[in-house]
Amino acid sequence: EAVKLMRGKPKSAINLTLSRKSEPLPIVVTIVRDVIRVQSVRSKWLEQGYAYIRITQFQEHTVASTVSHLNKLLQQAEADTAKPVKGIVLDLRNDPGGLLHAAVGVSATFLRDNVTVVSTDGRQPDAKRSFAAKPSDYLRGGSDPLTGLNPKAKTLPMVVLVNGGSASASEIVAGALQDHKRAVVLGTQTFGKGSVQTILPLTSSTAIKLTTARYYTPAGRSIQAKGIRPDFWVEESE
């Protein structure tokens, strides 16, 4: 309720009244609303020639950002022949998920064209769907960000890092890369958020959210309440 009241047009002002135990009277603070932009992809070089890509959430521009970061790192490696790239590390630890088409697009970045990424199944006929590594399944308008992808992204050795905080879209990507033997999954068991939820309007101001289907990896494994088991179990050091 509080968040709903604070939302508004960018650059508009809002007064917040705060109550603190240490202050006898409420404090009024004026803040200016703005669009919050979260960078969902980061990258860097790890020691000994490994390109590291960290995805914190699957958002609208995550696929394009992933391609951009990959191309930049691989271009740097091609320019310095003394330090060839040996592999790719995709870090999905503590990534809670996000948009389904973004997960399909990120998977397509590393997989062969047209292979299955994820499928859904439920009681209703329209719940049975399959999503593949092709533009029609990950694009939501605009140009295809994978058009300019460095082809080495699909062939270099690859490791995916996961843990108990990797959920939903993260599990879709990890499961697809694991089933197609494109990458080795390393870490601990993922969260197990593999349900498809549909919002059904009841009145003008209310709705009900129901679980209508489940996600399945290309090999037919259910993600729900099971998660993705890594190929190599490695606990994180504190």
What role is predicted for each listed range?
Residues 1-203:
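Cleft-lining beta-strand/loop regions that shape enzyme active-site pockets
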Residues 214, 218-238:
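Conserved functional hotspot residues or short segments at active or partner-binding sites
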Residues 102-103, 211, 216:
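Long, folded non-catalytic interaction modules
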